[in-house]
Amino acid sequence: MKIVVTKSAVKKLEADILAFPFCSGELKKQDAGVLSDFDISAHALKDFKAESGEIVLFYSSSEGHLIARVALLGLGDGKDPDDFRKAAASLAAKAMTMNLQRIAVDCSRFGTIAEDSKKRVGKLAETFVEGCFSGSYKFDRLKSGKLDKKKDDKKVKGISELILRFDASVFADAEEGAAQGEIVGSCQLMARDLVNLPGNYLQAEDIAKAAQDSGSRNGFAVKVLRKKEMEDLAMGGLLAVNQGSTHPPTFSILDYKPEGKAKAVVALVGKGVTFDSGGISLKPSEGMGEMKSDMSGAACVIAAVEAAARLGLSLRVIGLIPATDNMPDGSAQKPGDVITTYSGITVEVGNTDAEGRLILADALTYAKQEYNPDIIIDLATLTGACIVALGYSVAGLFSNNDKLAEEIYAAGISSGEKVWRMPLWDDYDELIKSEVADVNNTGGRGAGSVTAAKFLEKFIDGHKKWAHLDIAGPAFLSKSGGKVTGGTGFGVRLLIDLLKKWA
């Protein structure tokens, strides 16, 4: 999708549809001048409440404009930037259903809205563009018309151009914000594509290739450790999970370095289980197909590092992605096994379906010992218990640093990817004690997301600024889970928001 920011008069805009965004409070003051310009009755406003994402579509007979389709677009009260994202997503989705390729939006009111809500116009432009990317997303690359390159499916189209019209007084800020929104939006869509790929299309090697391709396109280094190197390093957690697989594991290291001095070194660790059957502790068959999404953390990390590079942030951002599938096999690890992780800590495998924490354990220790970063954040679709606690809209936040937790919470609000802090008290250590090893990888029925986080904490080697995000709920939504279905790319916007603040 091409993003065009312009100061041209509305009458000169050319597109398939022209949208006029309104806040709910504006309707009382509105003289219906917009509608009269298009020969549309002012009575049309009576049923338009300007709720976020609300659309009322008209067809103009005016000869003074080049666009016949006119839409009123609701922004809610205009105080929450996320309402702009939702509105834009709704507009893009509407355009997709109508097979429209060029969208124009008159954003002339954004200046007043920004002033009233004490927000930057650039921030509103950024979130609006992000929303358009989200609403235009459609995962159809495995349809026969897409797989067969010889077929020319002219019915399958997408939005090719988004034209945003701003007043000259805010143009520079809007242009910068829209450019950032394009980067964030496109990176999130890349993450969604990876999450939506089924297990027979995405193995550990494919995740490594996705990281390498991103590095090649955007100028950051990518190193991939193979199974032999993992064996030499004694990465017992990742290797144990991989025992039941016919596909070798990978450990991808993405390393973005800014041109000047880095203000900080940030390590992002993403769980990359390409398909999770549960292993010997087999999952129920119902819903197992969604376990292709168990590498959502890995996709998020690739997208965040790419965005950091494209934005030119003055941080060193290191992405670490342990990747494998988790399958039952005659050689698979078994409940009761004891493994030795990269850290030297021994683990009793209480349940082979608690595999994500085993591969993250090796990656977290590697991050601390090899790079000693200022901040470590890991993201993982780690526990169903977190879904029970927080549902599908919010991720669980665990951290050993109050300031870092506050920053992540604020970034969640700002980015529209909300998190809620969960306890990490030492009382929970008792639940993961083992009689035969240093620690057990499961803690029983209660507080499952907390005991998983307490397990991970043992592998950060004393690091003082670490956070764990359990994104099991919002990372993948089934058809009954909301308007967005499949992989959501949750965490990409949140991480980029954080990185931009630290840069």
UniProtKB/Swiss-Prot annotation:
Family as reported in the entry's similarity comment: Belongs to the peptidase M17 family.
Organism: Chlorobium phaeobacteroides (strain DSM 266 / SMG 266 / 2430)
Cofactor(s) needed for function: Mn(2+)
Chain sites annotated for binding Mn(2+) 1: D276, D353, E355
PROSITE patterns associated with the record: CYTOSOL_AP
Enzyme class, first EC level, given as a word: hydrolase
Domain of life, source organism: Bacteria
Keywords recorded for this protein, A-Z: Aminopeptidase, Cytoplasm, Hydrolase, Manganese, Metal-binding, Protease
Major location category of this protein: cytoplasm
Keyword Protease: yes
Co-factor remark: Binds 2 manganese ions per subunit.
BP GO terms, sorted: proteolysis
The enzyme's E.C. designation: 3.4.11.1, 3.4.11.10
Gene3D superfamilies: Leucine Aminopeptidase, subunit E, domain 1, Zn peptidases
Function: Presumably involved in the processing and regular turnover of intracellular proteins. Catalyzes the removal of unsubstituted N-terminal amino acids from various peptides.
PANTHER family to which the protein is assigned, alphabetical: CYTOSOL AMINOPEPTIDASE (PTHR11963:SF23), LEUCINE AMINOPEPTIDASE-RELATED (PTHR11963)
Active site: K283, R357
Known catalytic reactions: Release of an N-terminal amino acid, Xaa-|-Yaa-, in which Xaa is preferably Leu, but may be other amino acids including Pro although not Arg or Lys, and Yaa may be Pro. Amino acid amides and methyl esters are also readily hydrolyzed, but rates on arylamides are exceedingly low; Release of an N-terminal amino acid, preferentially leucine, but not glutamic or aspartic acids
Annotated protein name in UniProt: Probable cytosol aminopeptidase
GO molecular function: manganese ion binding; metalloaminopeptidase activity
Residues reported to bind Mn(2+) 2: K271, D276, D294, E355
GO CC, alphabetical: cytoplasm
Subcellular location as annotated: Cytoplasm
